[in-house]
Structure formats: structure tokens, C-alpha cells
Amino acid sequence: MIATPNFVNLSPDDYLELEANSSIKHEYIDGEVYAMAGATDTHVTIALNMAIALRNHLRGSGCRVYISDMKVRIQKAKSERFYYPDILVTCDQRDRDTPTYKQFPKLIIEVLSDSTEAFDRGDKFMDYQSIDSLEEYILINTRHPRLEIFRRQDDSWLFNTYSLSEDTDDPTFHIISLDFTEKIAAIYEDVNFNLPEN
């Protein structure tokens, strides 16, 4: 996300109207609107690999997988936010009623980049934690094969790291909320870690 807001003091309805007519995606934080930067080959490849694997696993389950063009709406007592996660999964029927955003995700995944990593780990994760339906939050590294999974347990979040290293034989990771297991290597298929970030 770009640090300087492009618009300020917009209502949520005005923001949604702006997004419906904009060729550029924006995230919304309490009336301020921020343009989003484009993604790299590595980022897009990782997100697509994960989304395809999840979609294949969830086919026929009633759960829906969305990639980076679907917003998640977060409403708190005195705050309202709209973010574009790289991947979100919702199994809640109420999300079928809102075609441009979802409010009840079970899983959110962010693919890290140099420009967004601090925000994805910090303020954005704090906002995501306020979503009652969210059971797991995953950060996928783009510099080396590593996934970090945060799982809600009561009032706290448990943390697990899964990585691909030379001393392990085809390791897997598990997303408990979706009963999904996959090889780490499959998520990084066709990824070239030597490509520049920009």
C-alpha cells in the first residue's frame, strides 16, 4: 500500500462507488483511500499456485476462494476498513449477498513484498484479527520458500512456520480451518527467486 492517501474523508459508500468506476484498486482506512501498487511475477505466481490448490480442494464444499480483486470489509465500533487480500476464503452464506466485498472470511493469505511486509505483519494483521470469522492468517514469503501460519485459538493466535530446506524431504503445510494439506514446493512451482523485486 502507498503511504500517502489519494482521497480523504470519504464515506464507505463513496469509496465503494469510487472503486466501481476506477481502473486502479484502492484500500480504505477510516475515510482515507490509498492506491495499491502492482505485483511482481513471483508474487502473482505464488498467489495463483495457492489459489488454484485451494480451489481444487474446496470444489463442491460451499466455500469460495477469491484472489486479489475481492475486498474484505472490516467494521469496528469507530472504524471501517476495506483491504484487498491476495487470497481469501469464505464459507459463510452471508458473503453471497455482497458481490464487491466479503465480511466473513475463514482464511486470509497475504503474499509478502518489500513494500507491504511491515504493514501485512503489523497494522493489517491487527485489523484482520478483529474479524470474528477469521480462523487462520497466512503470510507467504517471496524471497525464499517459507509460509507463516497464524491460527486463532480462543483469544490468542498461535504461530507456525513451514519452510523448504535442503535437509527436509518434500515438506508439507496444513491449513486446519479447511482441512487442507499441500507440499510447500507446489506453492513455489515456477517461481524464480533470482528475479528483481521491481
Feature-to-residue mapping (PLM):
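Gly/Pro/Ser/Thr-rich low-complexity, intrinsically disordered segments predominantly at protein N-termini
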Residues: 1-198
